[in-house]
């Protein structure tokens, strides 16, 4: 029997269970993996929107990542909501210590109801420091627009802007990209 892949999920907690760490745990488990977590923020939200976001102190995020990884070495890391520059830098510092190669970034920026989950300074740090450390980035269309400053209006725009988007992602340091 093949051992389960061990996935460390670094993301915000969604109280409704439809996104964030809760959704990632469900996905990893459904695919036969073993999910470990480091919570970056606690949200009060439901299917209609986000009421509040309470950040976890960066040192606590580092402790979660390092202590979990010391016991169970992750085969891959999936990163979701990182809401501030301090948190992004804290996660980068932790990643350098655990040296897992397969890092997937879902650059969560805006909740479905339009609630902004990351500030402009954090977006800059994400682009300048974190993207170059990931194996795969998986932005949705609004996130891709923020990262590239390319407006995607319809399927044709997605198709025609893909080469520019891929070049921009490569320039930022990403190895692979899946647009969702």
What annotation goes with each model-predicted range?
Residues 7-29:
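Glycine/serine-rich anion-binding loops at beta->alpha junctions
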Residues 2-9, 28-112:
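Conserved N-terminal subdomain of the carbohydrate kinase-like
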Residues 25-26, 89, 128, 163:
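Alpha-helical segments flanking ligand/cofactor-binding loops in enzyme cores
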Residues 15-21, 82-92, 117-121:
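Glycine-rich anion/phosphate-binding loops
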Residues 12, 106, 140:
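Active-site glycine-centered loops adjacent to acidic/histidine catalytic or metal-binding residues
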Residues 78-81, 111-118, 147-153:
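Flexible, glycine/proline-enriched loop segments at strand-loop-helix junctions
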Residues 119-180:
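Conserved phosphate/ATP/ADP-binding segment of small-molecule kinases
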């Amino acid at each position: 029997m093949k051992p389960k892949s061990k996935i460390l999920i670094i993301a915000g907690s969604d109280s409704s269970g439809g996104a964030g760490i809760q959704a990632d745990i469900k996905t990893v488990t459904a695919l036969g993996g073993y999910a470990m977590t480091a919570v970056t923020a606690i949200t009060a939200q439901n299917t209609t929107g986000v009421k509040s976001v309470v950040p976890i102190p960066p040192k606590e995020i580092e402790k979660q990542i390092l202590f979990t990884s010391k016991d169970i070495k992750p085969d891959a890391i999936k990163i979701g909501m990182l809401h501030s520059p301090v948190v992004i830098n804290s996660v980068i510092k932790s990643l350098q210590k655990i040296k897992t190669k397969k890092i997937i970034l879902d650059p969560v920026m805006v909740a479905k109801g339009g609630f902004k989950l990351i500030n402009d300074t954090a977006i800059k740090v994400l682009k300048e420091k974190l993207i170059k450390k990931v194996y795969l980035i998986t932005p949705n269309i609004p996130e891709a627009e923020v990262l590239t400053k390319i407006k995607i209006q319809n399927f044709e725009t997605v198709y025609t802007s893909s080469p520019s988007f891929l070049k921009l992602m490569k320039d930022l340091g990403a190895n692979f990209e899946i647009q969702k």
